[in-house]
A protein has these predicted regions:
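A generic short alpha-helical patch detector that favors 3-5-residue windows
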Residues: 10, 58, 83-87
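Periplasmic-binding protein-like
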Residues: 10, 14, 118-126
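Sec-exported extracytoplasmic/periplasmic mature domains
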Residues: 19-27, 44-48, 71, 96-106, ...
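Ligand/substrate-recognition segments at binding pockets and active sites
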Residues: 1-57, 104, 131-132
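Short, solvent-exposed loop/turn and secondary-structure capping segments
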Residues: 10-15, 62-65, 139
Length: 158
């Protein structure tokens, strides 16, 4: 299991825990922890069988994940981060249609269908949602966005 050891909070410890849990069910796995400068080119080149990878969605749109992580790797942005090689022509067709669909209800239904197929096929194995804590005084309130970027307009001081 390839794992960065200086990219995510407790990344190497998470990988150690996964390797230990898999050993309990008979899945022999060797941990290969490395600095992110080595890790990312390694997995991007497909030189891995399983790896820990984090993902954030700055667009707040599921299409970003579908297009980048799930679509079959091809040219341009399509499947650019699909390092595991997941491929399903039906999911690809849905993603291509989602890209140009303007009807919100139809688009949402297609997103749900594509994500549902991917989940049933175990295209990825989600481990956890990393929350990066922010420290502040008790009287300071701010909404913690999924992309971990503070918006000053959302800060409230009581």
């Amino acid at each position: 299991m390839d794992c960065p050891n200086n990219r995510y909070i407790n990344d190497e410890a998470i990988c150690q825990a996964v390797v230990a849990m898999w050993a309990k069910i008979g899945v022999k796995t060797k941990l290969n922890a490395m600095p992110r400068a080595t890790f990312f080119p390694k997995v991007a080149n497909g030189d891995t069988s399983i790896y820990l990878f984090g993902w954030g969605v700055p667009t707040f749109d599921a299409f970003y994940t579908l297009e980048s992580l799930i679509r079959t790797k091809s040219t341009g942005a399509s499947g650019a981060f699909n390092y595991g090689g997941y491929s399903n022509p039906k999911v690809d067709a849905l993603i291509d249609t989602i890209k140009t669909e303007t009807d919100d209800a139809k688009r949402t239904a297609m997103i749900q269908e594509a994500l549902g197929i991917h989940a049933k096929e175990f295209g990825t194995i989600p481990l956890h949602d990393q929350i990066i804590p922010w420290a502040m005084k008790k009287n300071v309130k701010v909404i913690h966005r999924p992309d971990n970027r503070p918006v000053i307009e959302w800060v409230r001081i009581d």
